Amino acid sequence: MCQGSICPWRGPLPLLHVRTWIEPVVASTQVATSLYDAGLLLVVKASFGVGPSSNHSSSPSPRGALEDEQQRAISNFYIVYHLVMGLTPLLSAYGLGWLSDRYHRKVSICVPLLGFLLSRLVLLLKVLLDWPVEMLYAGAALTGLCGGFSAFWSGVMALGSLSSSEGRRSLRLIVIDLILGLAGFCGSMVSGHLFKQMVGHSKQGLVLTACSVSCATCALLYSLFVLKVPESKAKPRKAVDIVPGTVGRYDTLDPDQTDKQSVVRPPPPPAMAKSKQIIIGLLFVGAIIYDLAVVGTVDVIPLFVLREPLSWNQVQVGYGMASGYTIFITSFLGVLVFSRYFQDTTMIMIGMVSFASGALLLAFVKETYMFYIARAIMLFALIPITTIRSAMSKLIKGSSYGKVFVTLQLSLTLTGVVTSTLYNKIYQLTMEKFIGTCFALSSFLSFLAILPIGIVAYKQASWLQPGDITEK
């Protein structure tokens, strides 16, 4: 049967539950972010411009040299930008997570949203006042000092975990990712068209950046005045968890199913508790290695599509970014199906293989249609990180969600900073010889990330014993 929080049309009480949904904040924020990301790339490209470009241009070598110089300038800009964006949250993100756990869950959501709004305003002012491109670093710093994406997403994951039962948590968190993906898809699809609204005008990009600021403002106001913190879904049980320390297996998507299960075994011994810590560590390692591959690929793709052999224009750039967000939809469908039959570790490995295969094909892309085929192969690429978060949430106390999630997110952010710098330098060194080098490296790292997850799966299998779980 549908419950109030699932069926909001069933009366005034469910209407209160609607205010606990984090999805409107995620959607507004992601539309603003997708518009901002496209606008940032196109504004920076225009700032280092070499004149108008056409798709698949066959220009003489002097123009090719200018385009290479433009690529290096854009790449160097993003190296500094990602360094600022990645390092400044270290000053505030964990503190916001601690305040969120101790005082109010909305702290780690509202403060980062303020930073997002300020950075969007900086881009808008750059377009309006023709500021130097270096002023965009200030916008990145403001975002980071307010916690950045690390604090924001950890807050979103904490609220999502609190509002879901353990048996439904992977699905709940992937639904949030689905909303993020749909919003990003919509924003990216229109970004190129919005950027061209004032083509040839000195304020090109004004409409795009203004829309980004508007969406960021809506997200902040909603989180301040409408959003309510949900009550924890945790219920007292007559028995301990299904199998202490394991990463759950979903035989059903019924959120109450886990409450119907009982265990006829004593509390876990100290060795089991230590194994739980080892599993958390292995999940961290797997997440970090996989994130290295993903971040490196995501950072290089915008540069890759602007250069030959693709040489995309503004609208094509928007469509290409939108194709990346379709992964959120396919990953959601993947979790919806796989969670009925597979353990979390199996789903994680499926996602890693999916991304690794797509990245390998991306290394050899020569035409636009090949790019979209490679992106289609990555259809389950989002499953690993989201499922790892869900798996970790089952091994920690609810009161520690904020700190653990922000620690994971900060770890991913730090590795992302290193990866961004490394990949951009590798791209600059190899773009004239083999432009797909970075993608081949990402494929290797993604396959490598399967190893720690496989160890987790092996440890789980050694714990499972016949008769451990009995139905009431």
Named regions from a protein language model:
Residues 139-179:
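Cytoplasmic helix-loop-helix junction between adjacent transmembrane helices
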Residues 168-196, 215-216, 409-421:
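Glycine-rich segments within core transmembrane alpha-helices of 12-TM secondary carriers
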Residues 215-230, 440-472:
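Multi-pass alpha-helical transporter architecture, strongest
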Residues 27, 119, 130-151, 288, ...:
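Hydrophobic core of transmembrane alpha-helices in multi-pass small-molecule transporters
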Residues 89-91, 317-341, 351, 355, ...:
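Transmembrane alpha-helices of Major Facilitator/SLC transporters
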Residues 114-131, 353-366:
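C-terminal ends and interior cores of transmembrane alpha-helices
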Residues 85-105, 195-196, 330-344, 427-428:
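Helix-to-loop junctions at the C-terminal end of transmembrane segments
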Residues 195-215, 425-447:
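A membrane-interface helix-boundary motif in multi-pass transporters
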